[in-house]
Amino acid sequence: MTSDSRRSLRLLISLTLFLASCESQTQRGTVFAPGHSSELAQKRGLVDVRRVIPGIAVDLRYATASNVTGHAIYPPHMPCLLRSETAEKLKQAQAILHAQGYGLRIWDAYRPPEAQEALHKSGGSTGMFLSPNAGWSRHCGGIAVDLTLVDVQGREQRMPTAFDQDLTHASRNYHGSDPVVRQNVQRLQAAMKQAGFAQLESEWWHFDDATYIDNPQPIIYGWQIAIPFMPPP
């Protein structure tokens, strides 16, 4: 074999390995394209909430450093996904609050199981994040949502605690003395309950689709819908 032939063979092998790597990354979800992820998600029963509820406020905290890990574990432009039936219920809650001069801001919706594991490792001692050994969070099936109350200008209203903070005061049963906070909690709870959600007792911001409380949906891994996992350093 001549030197030119060997050089050509090496180039061919390198190109083949590169293409195989790209294909593997796409299949495992490490190459992120929000539109493509939304299409794959739809095939598994998930929809982008922004398309179902135009104008709803979304601030996915795990796509920023403002979370218990201190790092973004979702990619930028992460779609805000829920099961289609759950998203329709959320649309009802938004309409109920809109009629009162308020609305919702979503902090988390569908959560890849890969991210759930990272959250448990970072904040497991707080009791906020279910261990995978004990079962998966309903977020991982797209049937749970974390959210808060905003006014018509999109300003967050006073609530018992910040997101993912101070579980000793984060109960759905507010015991503080601030009447405004109490009213805000009750307003949010009433709208979500009327729309078909059940609230997690320990977190005022967490609501589960009541239809699936005793009928959990299959978890959907991020790689299955081309959403890459970004582990904290």
What are these regions (language model features)?
Residues 10-20:
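Bacterial N-terminal signal peptides
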Residues 115-116:
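Short, well-ordered surface patches within globular domains
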Residues 2-11:
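Bacterial N-terminal signal peptides that target proteins for export
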Residues 22-107, 121-202, 208-233:
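Extracytoplasmic cell-surface/polysaccharide-interacting catalytic and binding patches
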Residues 1-2, 105:
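Compositionally biased, intrinsically disordered low-complexity regions used as flexible
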Residues 112:
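Segments that shape or occlude catalytic/ligand-binding pockets
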